């Protein structure tokens, strides 16, 4: 196993070295959605999303301070995380591009909080804003999950700065039981 140290211990790390190292962590791909104050939908592709707590059920998403969508996350009381399936790479790219009309030809429906939910997502977590924390050049938005929708399928993944796909899993004898 080889390693390529880019900084000496205790000297800090530059942004490019940090990004290259973090790119080695495989993540799922999601689109986070929110409404603005006039009720218009907004969304953005993210991979900086994670679960935080089971009781209460909390998730977080990190929004860059330069992102246009940040203002909507600072004023809205709800948002959603739409976890993408492997066939939704084009949708991920559409919501990652700069521009205001990302919802132009995208089908969506309003969840119980009113936020846009994507019907073909692998899973959707609808959240009430629980807390916002400024940290470095991002705002961490923590949401309490008020609704969860799950479908069968395989996730879209991101690793080493590129989209990836899983091999289909081997058949299992266990059943998935969602409760609550």
State where each predicted segment sits:
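Basic, polyanion-binding surface patches
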Residues: 1-180
